[in-house]
């Protein structure tokens, strides 16, 4: 077996780690528990070529597919069946993790060992070759969508804690990632790497001691090693004064990136269990918002002010809602008794479930909310996504990034709203 596979740990051990991460943390996009205390917390790259996977209009539409989706009954074939495979320009496979200064595989079983039957597979045929699992399904997806770009995402909310340590030797870190992403075992599947270092030079459950230049150093190292392949990153959307955007020089890092995903969601949620209720993905501020600067427009404005080119910024859209129970007030700002019950984990639910069981009853700050009995949820709908994409076009942004595909409706309503608006 190849060197890249030898560097990973055993399949069984990885499977346990991946499932645990999926069950215990909100799928990688949260801002450091998003409490009010959060606010207290140069060589030139080659020009991005035409081989970036953009649409005819130049708009980028990224969809995340998570490795642990297989344990929730969602597979690459579902992306095809929903129609979303024809609408996204890039697919990020999330997540690998970082340990001992290197990129590591998250779950070997899900990634390349799980057998797919004809009924489950993109090709409609049983697995017969040595390469199986998600990666083989992604290979089949690219065969029917040859313009689709597939990137391997590393880090995220759970697994980015060790990136600061890895940055003690940026080139070694980047080379290890290159070797895994481009392992001959899955040659041609991946077109580059996406780096989910969400909180450089800031504190979360531990404190990253990188300096403000560390993000740029990382992106430079990855560009040097990956060459013409895609190099992207998912970054914080904390637009508060003195917040997480201010802690890092994102403009310097953007020089080496094809684009940056701004994770403009998970601003508010049940980590404040008694409320106040607030929309987790506000595009703009509103009277009574719990933390100034916790909205998409503030984040984009701050990144532009740093010098990040508009066309390298993607607006984040989430397929999940966040909610509370014990709420009597229909409008935002009400008290609660705790996280709302869910088919997933308390306080977070897929759009496809909420649209059917708790339809939106109002909008605020460019997103939707719903009051159903004693439950209060906020989430985006096709209508609010359409408005957000219109705003993104007005701002000259490069497109959108969607976390994540399994939460969308069976007909891909949210992805379709992104695609339709960006390309009209």
Regions found by a protein language model. Name each.
Residues 177-209, 266:
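Active-site groove signature of glycoside hydrolases
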């Amino acid at each position: 077996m190849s060197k890249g596979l030898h560097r990973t740990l055993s399949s069984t051990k990885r499977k346990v780690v991946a499932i645990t991460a999926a069950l215990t943390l909100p799928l990688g996009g949260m801002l450091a528990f998003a409490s009010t205390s959060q606010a207290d917390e140069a060589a030139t790259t080659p020009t991005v070529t035409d081989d970036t996977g953009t649409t005819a209009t130049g708009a980028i539409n990224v969809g995340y597919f998570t490795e642990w989706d297989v344990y929730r009954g969602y597979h690459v074939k579902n992306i095809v069946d929903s129609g979303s495979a024809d609408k996204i320009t890039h697919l990020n496979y999330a997540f690998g993790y970082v340990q001992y200064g290197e990129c590591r595989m998250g779950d070997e079983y899900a990634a390349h060992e799980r057998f797919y039957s004809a009924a489950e597979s993109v090709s409609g045929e049983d697995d017969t070759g040595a390469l199986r699992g998600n990666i083989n399904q992604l290979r089949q997806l690219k065969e029917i969508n040859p313009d689709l770009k597939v990137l391997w995402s590393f880090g995220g909310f759970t697994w980015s804690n060790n990136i600061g340590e890895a940055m003690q030797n940026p080139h070694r870190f980047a080379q290890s990632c290159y070797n895994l992403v481009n392992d001959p075992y899955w040659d041609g599947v991946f077109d580059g790497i996406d780096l989910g270092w969400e909180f450089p030079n800031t504190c979360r459950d531990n404190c990253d001691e990188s300096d403000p230049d560390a993000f740029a150093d990382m992106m430079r190292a990855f560009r040097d090693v990956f060459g013409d392949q895609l190099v992207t990153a998912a970054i914080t959307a904390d637009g508060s004064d003195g917040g997480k955007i201010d802690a890092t020089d994102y403009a310097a890092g953007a020089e080496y990136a094809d684009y940056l995903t701004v994770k403009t969601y998970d601003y508010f949620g049940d980590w404040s269990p008694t409320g106040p209720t607030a929309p987790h993905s506000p595009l703009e501020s509103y009277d009574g918002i719990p933390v100034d600067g916790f909205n998409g427009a503030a984040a984009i404005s701050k990144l532009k002010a740093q010098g990040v080119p508009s066309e390298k910024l993607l607006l984040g859209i989430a397929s999940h809602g966040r909610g509370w129970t014990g709420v009597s007030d229909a409008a935002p700002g009400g008290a609660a008794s705790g996280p709302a019950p869910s088919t997933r984990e308390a306080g977070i639910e897929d759009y496809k479930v909420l649209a059917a069981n708790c339809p939106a009853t109002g909008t605020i700050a460019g997103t939707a909310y719903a009051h159903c009995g004693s439950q209060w949820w906020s989430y985006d709908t096709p209508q609010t996504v359409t408005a957000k994409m219109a705003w993104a076009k007005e701002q000259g942004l490069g497109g959108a990034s969607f976390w994540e595909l399994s939460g969308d409706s069976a007909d891909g309503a949210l992805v379709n709203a992104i695609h339709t608006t960006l390309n009209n």
